[in-house]
Structure formats: structure tokens, C-alpha cells
Amino acid sequence: VRDAYIAKPENCVYHCAGNEGCNNLCTCNGAT
């Protein structure tokens, strides 16, 4: 569920703000 949430680009930016590793994970999950 959490992965599906962060895979959405708008959610990823909010959830991963300032967290490069998390942003990279989101990108791998299909977010832009």
C-alpha cells in the first residue's frame, strides 16, 4: 500500500521531499 502511494508522482514529491534516496525509489517505482 505504501509503495502504491509513493509511486504517484504528486505523493512522492510530498512524501520524499528532501530525501534523495526516497526520490530514487519512487522513480524506480514509476513516478516521474
From Swiss-Prot:
Q: Which domain of life is it from?
A: Eukaryota
**SUPFAM superfamilies for the chain:** Scorpion toxin-like
GO molecular-function terms, A-Z = sodium channel inhibitor activity; toxin activity
Query: Which keywords fit this entry according to its UniProt record?
Result: Disulfide bond, Ion channel impairing toxin, Neurotoxin, Secreted, Toxin, Voltage-gated sodium channel impairing toxin
Pfam families given for it? Toxin_3 (PF00537)
InterPro entries attached to this UniProt entry: LCN-type_CS_alpha_beta_dom, Scorpion_toxin-like_sf, Scorpion_toxinL/defensin
Tissue and organ distribution = Expressed by the venom gland.
PROSITE patterns hit by this protein: LCN_CSAB
Question: Which compartments does it reside in?
Answer: Secreted
What Gene Ontology terms describe where this protein resides (cellular component)?
extracellular region
Span of domain LCN-type CS-alpha/beta: 2-32
Question: What's the chief localization of this chain?
Answer: secreted
Q: What does this protein do?
A: Alpha toxins bind voltage-independently at site-3 of sodium channels (Nav) and inhibit the inactivation of the activated channels, thereby blocking neuronal transmission. This toxin dose-dependently delays inactivation of voltage-gated sodium channels (Nav) (EC(50)=0.91 uM), and shifts the steady-state activation and inactivation to hyperpolarized direction. In addition, it dose-dependently alters calcium dynamics and increases phosphorylation of MAP kinases 1/3 (MAPK1/MAPK3) and cAMP-response element binding (CREB) proteins in neocortical neurons.
**What is recorded about the protein's domains?**
Has the structural arrangement of an alpha-helix connected to antiparallel beta-sheets by disulfide bonds (CS-alpha/beta).
- Similarity comment: Belongs to the long (4 C-C) scorpion toxin superfamily. Sodium channel inhibitor family. Alpha subfamily.
Q: What is this protein called?
A: Sodium channel neurotoxin BmK NT2
Native organism is: Olivierus martensii
Q: What is the lineage of its organism?
A: Eukaryota, Metazoa, Ecdysozoa, Arthropoda, Chelicerata
